[in-house]
Amino acid sequence: MLRSLVQNPRVRARVLERVDEFRLNNLSNEEVWFRELTLCLLTANSSFISAYQALNCLGDKIYYANEEVIRSILKSCKYRFYNLKAKYIIMAREKVYGKLKEEITPLADSDQQLAREKLLNIKGIGMKEASHFLRNVGYFDLAIIDRHLIDFMRRIGAIGETNVKHLSKSRYISLESVLKSIALNLNISVGILDLFIWYKETNTIVK
């Protein structure tokens, strides 16, 4: 089932095009990296579409606007968690903007799990968000475990009932190892497998 999707020329071409975009992000500047981090902050507990729309509403204000302005923009865009996420964006900017790429690149180049651990120090970034960020800046060895991947693994019998909203770190790593085994069997990276599963579950490649 999944193997045929991975081997489908049309779907594979679309997925690999997205992968190339992530690889280009890896070569991009600090502004691009912080924008991707902001997207991941906004995606937590929200849909990707809602987060992406909110990010576009914010534009370059993520780099300089104060918390009140960011909160107001998020609210006007009908983004649900405008108070909390405005606070997180400001905290992240004060903590890592200007040195994000410099600090994460050497870590991720040598050990992506260590890079993920470093990102967990940013308020609002959990295992999924850190993995999502690293994938979006060109690192593909970590799984982005959301409800779509949980549903998929449950349907194929790889896991039992799992509450995606209350994943402990150890449970996340356990589920990630299941996905890595599936990816290894298909001869692709787990971060790329995610895109195929996302396509199968949503018929889109926007993640």
UniProtKB/Swiss-Prot annotation:
CDD domains: ENDO3c
GO biological-process terms attached to the record: base-excision repair
Gene3D superfamilies per the UniProt record, alphabetical: Helix-hairpin-Helix base-excision DNA repair enzymes (C-terminal) (1.10.1670.10), Hypothetical protein, domain 2 (1.10.340.30)
Nucleotide-binding recorded as keyword: no
Site residues (Important for guanine/8-oxoguanine distinction), renumbered to this chain: 207
Annotated EC: 3.2.2.-, 4.2.99.18
Active site: 128, 146
SUPFAM superfamilies from the UniProt entry: DNA-glycosylase
Source organism superkingdom: Archaea
UniProt GO molecular function: class I DNA-(apurinic or apyrimidinic site) endonuclease activity; hydrolase activity, hydrolyzing N-glycosyl compounds
Annotated Pfam families: Ogg-HhH
Catalytic reaction(s) noted: 2'-deoxyribonucleotide-(2'-deoxyribose 5'-phosphate)-2'-deoxyribonucleotide-DNA = a 3'-end 2'-deoxyribonucleotide-(2,3-dehydro-2,3-deoxyribose 5'-phosphate)-DNA + a 5'-end 5'-phospho-2'-deoxyribonucleoside-DNA + H(+)
Keywords: DNA damage, DNA repair, Glycosidase, Hydrolase, Lyase, Multifunctional enzyme
Recorded family membership: Belongs to the type-2 OGG1 family.
Protein's job: Catalyzes the excision of an oxidatively damaged form of guanine (7,8-dihydro-8-oxoguanine = 8-oxoG) from DNA. Also cleaves the DNA backbone at apurinic/apyrimidinic sites (AP sites).
Name of the protein in its database record: 8-oxoguanine DNA glycosylase/AP lyase
Species: Saccharolobus islandicus (strain L.S.2.15 / Lassen #1)
